[in-house]
Amino acid sequence: MFSTDPVVYCVGDEYRIFFYTRFPSFAKIRVGGTEFDDCRCGIMRSAKGMRGITVPKSLLDECGEYTVCLDVITARVAYGTKTVKTVEKSYAFRPVKSGAPVRAFMTGDAHGNAQRSVKAAKTFGGFDFLIVNGDMSDKCEKTNSFEVAHNVAAELTRGGIPVVYARGNHENRGAAAELIYDYIPLRNGLTYYTFRLGSIWGLVLDCGEDKGDEHSEYGGSVRFHKFRKEQTAYMRELIDDAQNAFAAPGVEHRVVVSHIPFIRDMNKTFTIENETYAEWAKLMFEIKPDALLSAHMHTYEIMRPGSPHARFPAPCPTVVGTECRDGYLGATGLIFDKKGITVDFVRSDGKTVLSEKI
């Protein structure tokens, strides 16, 4: 009945629970004694495929369990729709706790090879939450391209721990790119947002593409300049409301997640948005993150403030953590404790190539 286990994405003060269904059905999720429907504007969704239901983060954290419920449809008609049976499956959920060391795993740049991400995670070992940092598919000509990110997250978490998602530039390429919004977590329809997991506060930014909107590669299909400006305004809003955001009670660590490491120097083709990205870097001095967590470069790097590779001054290290090679995929383990963050660069071939405190 279910194609995979669910994925529980953290967005703001909510969880977005995504799962695939094999048959037309009405879906809901039960947490404690409360049910949440897969419903839009009063109409229950019924098509098979990806489904997404939002539940309050505080409620699921408290209950530690949720149940996915499907009413399987035999006839979806104008008058007298019929369902044949109800299928339920329950999942234990482990929220991120404050205080104790927290282990996170960041993957990205799989470009369609899901199993390499899974193998790299085994090298790192168990973790408390997952970061999926873009370019899990190479292109998005069809909606099944979005299954790579979902399948990796489902296999690594089994619906039992939180996931943070950042869109990569390759998710913007192809005829299906405009349909991704039914397959990923959003905040009010947007791919940038904040999250709070235990004592860790995070901001997800979305650089969009890696070249200018006018580039011939896109053929007029993108408008990311305005989209980036909107994120500048969003960062300013967070700074104005700092006591309810990154300076909220109990916050011990802050991270910014962005597929593209916008602070890093690039070659001429990829050097875009100087004004906007300089402003983002400046605003980060007010947010004071412990790290910028990125992918995109297909390599490993910890770029500290003052590095000759830095395009702009930065208040924190940039961790570029998804090495992509013919024989293996690299990913990053992160261990948050009171002394900082330990970065482990791990590979799908079982090797750990670096462990460094930042």
Positions of PLM-derived features:
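Active-site-proximal segments of metal-dependent phosphoesterases and phosphodiesterases across multiple
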Residues: F224, A245-A291
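An acidic-aromatic substrate-binding cleft motif
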Residues: T81-N133, D138
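Loop/turn elements at helix/coil->beta-strand transitions in domains of secreted/extracellular proteins
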Residues: A100-R103, G125-L130, R158-V164, L197-G202, ...
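Acidic, histidine-bearing metal-coordination/catalytic regions of metal-dependent phosphoesterases
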Residues: M1-F105, T342, R347-I358
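Core catalytic region of metal-dependent phosphoesterases/phosphodiesterases
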Residues: E62, S117-A176
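The substrate-binding groove and active-site-proximal loops of carbohydrate-active enzymes
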Residues: T107-H111, M136-T143, V163, H170, ...
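Extended active-site neighborhood of metal-dependent phosphoesterases/phosphodiesterases
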Residues: D71-K89, E147-A245, E279-W280, I302-C324, ...
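Active-site neighborhood of phospho(di)ester-bond hydrolases with catalytic His/Asp-centered motifs
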Residues: F105-D109, F129-D135, I161-N169, V255-H259, ...
